[in-house]
């Protein structure tokens, strides 16, 4: 623990925007303040400064369940993130098969296992660079269903070959459509926010 969360929480009082620009929920920040003690993995820890807007950029891979849990926790604690937290529609999404493959790959390596958190971070980044990922932009049409069907066909072959159980399309489709419905109010193009902010001389803090 290097104290990054504490440092960001301190600096956030002096900036207008705090942005997460890469990584995922495999690591997190612990912030202790007047609201309590919080462990957050996706929402920028600068969100605790009431005049600061949090941005989650396209370089961040998102587990939607984790993000929703953090938003709910912060709102219940009186932080009030609605209207102050925006997620890039270009951010890639961690799917159930990413987590399963993360674990199966580790088991297959035996003594040479990497020691990952098994949260799907590596597999989702692999899909991103190989143009196999799913992003929030896909949910605005039936592109999500199309991409999910293709990816699930591919991923189930690997999962079964490594001794796992094939995943069901309908269950994943319905669950993730539900996630999108709940997160849609937070999904917004960030380019204009950043460009306008820079033109206006606003201060940005980049959080890793």
Model-derived regions: residue spans:
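Non-transmembrane, aqueous-exposed alpha-helical and coiled segments at domain scale
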Residues: 1-207
């Amino acid at each position: 623990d290097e104290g990054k969360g504490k440092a960001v929480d301190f600096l956030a009082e002096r900036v207008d925007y705090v942005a997460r620009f890469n990584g995922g929920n495999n690591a997190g920040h612990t912030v202790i303040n007047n609201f309590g003690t919080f462990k957050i993995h996706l929402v920028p820890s600068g969100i605790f400064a009431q005049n600061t807007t949090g941005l989650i950029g396209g370089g961040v891979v998102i587990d939607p369940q984790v993000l929703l849990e953090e938003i709910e926790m912060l709102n219940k604690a009186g932080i009030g993130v609605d209207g102050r937290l925006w997620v890039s529609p270009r951010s890639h999404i961690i799917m159930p098969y990413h987590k399963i493959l993360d674990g199966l790959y580790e088991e297959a390596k035996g003594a040479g296992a990497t020691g990952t958190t098994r949260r799907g971070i590596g597999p989702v980044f692999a899909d991103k660079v190989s143009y196999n990922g799913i992003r929030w932009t896909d949910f605005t049409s039936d592109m999500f269903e199309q991409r999910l069907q293709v990816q699930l066909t591919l991923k189930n072959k690997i999962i079964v070959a490594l001794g796992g159980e094939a995943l069901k399309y309908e269950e994943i489709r319905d669950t993730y459509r539900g996630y999108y419905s709940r997160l849609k109010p937070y999904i917004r193009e960030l380019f204009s926010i950043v460009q306008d902010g820079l033109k206006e001389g606003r201060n940005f803090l980049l959080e890793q």
